[in-house]
Amino acid sequence: MKKEPFVTKAQLDEIIKTYPTPFHLYDEKGIRDNAKAVKEAFSWNPGFREYFAVKATPNPYILKILQEYDMGCDCSSYTELMLSKSCGFDGKHIMFSSNDTPAEEFAYADKLGAIINLDDFTHIDFLEKTIGHIPETISCRYNPGGVFELSNGIMDNPGDSKYGMTKDQLIEAFKILKSKGAKYFGVHAFLASNTVTNEYYPKLAGELFELIVELKEKTGCDIKFVNRSEERRVGKECRSRWSPYH
C-alpha cells in the first residue's frame, strides 16, 4: 500500500508563515479514522477497550480525541495519571502499568480508581502497605520466560526480561490477592516490541487464553479481562499499546 503524506508541501509552506519551526503537526482525520476502525473491528466484543499509551504522545488534545471513541489511557507514571485525570478519564478508562513504582504513584492510581497492573510479585505487599488494602479489581503482568517465537523467527526473549511474573508466581499472586479482598482479576502481557506481522496478535492471545483457563482451575479467581500489550514504532516516532480483549 502506497502511503501519501496527509499534508502537501504547499500547505506546509503556508503553515510555517504563521507557526515557526520546529513544531509537531498531527493528522486529526487519520487519528479519528484509525480510532474508529479499531473500535469497529472489535465491536463483536462488548467488553473491548483500547488503551492508548500516554507516554507515546502525552498531548491532551489527542487524548481528548481518542476519548470520543471510548478509548482509555495506559499510564506508567504519576504525570501520565495526572494528565489522564485532567482530560476527564475515569478509573475504568485508566490502566496503570509501571516498573519500580514509588508509593505515591500507587496511592494516586488507587485514588483515581485506576486499574492497577502489578509488575512484580513483591508489589503485592508493597501496594497493600501503601494504600491500606488490595483493590477489588487488580491485574498482574505475565512473563512466560524462554523466547517468544513466530514462524518467521524469534521476536523477543522474555526470559531475559526482568519484568512480569512467572506462571508459578502468577498463580500464587492470584491466590494471595484473592485472600486479601480482590474479586476481579486481569492478566497483562507484553512479549515483543516493534512487531510488523499480524501473526503476533493471535499467537499471544491464544497463549493468554490458555493461561487463563489454567489460572481459573488452580485459583478459582474470577478473571475478567486480558490486557494484550504491544509496541510499534514507525520511523521511531509512533507507538501504540493494544488491549483488544479487555
Regions found by a protein language model. Give the residues of each.
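Active-site loop/helix belt of alpha/beta enzymes
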Residues: P144-K236
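A structural signal for short, well-ordered beta-strand segments and their strand-loop junctions
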Residues: N117, S139, G186, N227-S229, ...
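Short, well-ordered, mixed-charge alpha-helical segments that flank or form enzyme active sites
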Residues: M82-L83, P102-E105, I124-L127, G146-S151, ...
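Positively charged, low-complexity/disordered segments
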Residues: G235-H246
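Glycine-rich, aromatic-flanked loop segments that form ligand/cofactor-binding clefts
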Residues: H133-V147
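Anionic group-transfer/hydrolysis microenvironments
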Residues: K29, K55, S76, F121, ...
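A charged N-terminal "starter" segment
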Residues: M1-E136, K175, S179, K183, ...
